[in-house]
A protein has these predicted regions:
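Beta-strand elements of well-folded, non-transmembrane domains
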Residues: 91-97, 112
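Residue-level signal for tight coil/turn positions that link beta-strands
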Residues: 73, 80-82, 116
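A solvent-exposed, acidic/Ser-Thr-rich amphipathic alpha-helical stretch
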Residues: 4-5, 23-78, 88, 103
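A short hydrophobic beta-strand element
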Residues: 81-91
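Short, low-complexity N-terminal intrinsically disordered segments enriched in polar/charged residues
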Residues: 1-29, 38, 135-138
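Short beta-strand edge/turn micro-motifs at domain boundaries
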Residues: 103-135
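A short, polar/proline- and glycine-enriched secondary-structure boundary/capping micro-motif
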Residues: 95-98, 131-137
Length: 138
């Protein structure tokens, strides 16, 4: 398997970890020992324990009963033992509070590093799709 194929597979596993809000799956793809960072619209998490508790637990697990993250248009650039992945995504969910459906679209950048021969996520930054209206996006 090439590095690019391994990274594409890792992104698929990342989506599965989100869809199931499963930190056991997530721990197989994140660098759980490093200085990892996850920037998302509801906050910034520093370190694996914060990502596990606040993003997987409080955001994905507590807020939604169903989740489906659909990554698309992956662009992978490998730089030795580091890689950058950029992709668009669509997220379908059911809100736990009232059962209402939620559909959002966005974009994501992931920085990965290869440790022990395996790719791991070191940094994620995701946001909604760009806005182009007057006085938007600043």
């Amino acid at each position: 398997m090439t590095d690019k194929q391994a990274i594409e597979s890792l992104v698929a596993t990342y989506a599965e970890s989100i869809n199931k809000a499963d930190t056991d799956i997530a721990s197989t793809i994140w660098d759980t020992t490093g200085d990892v960072v996850f920037i998302h619209p509801r906050g910034t998490e520093y370190g694996w324990e914060a990502i596990k508790a606040n993003f997987y637990g409080k955001t994905m697990g507590d807020m939604f009963t169903k989740r489906e993250l659909k990554p698309r248009d992956l662009s992978v650039a490998v730089f030795g033992d580091m890689a950058v992945v950029v992709f668009m995504w669509e997220f379908h969910a059911t809100c736990r509070a009232d059962g209402a459906p939620l559909v959002t679209e966005g974009r994501e950048t992931q920085v990965m590093r290869k440790t022990g021969g395996k790719w791991r996520i070191a940094h994620v930054h995701y946001s909604n799709m760009p806005v182009t209206g007057d006085k938007q996006g600043f």
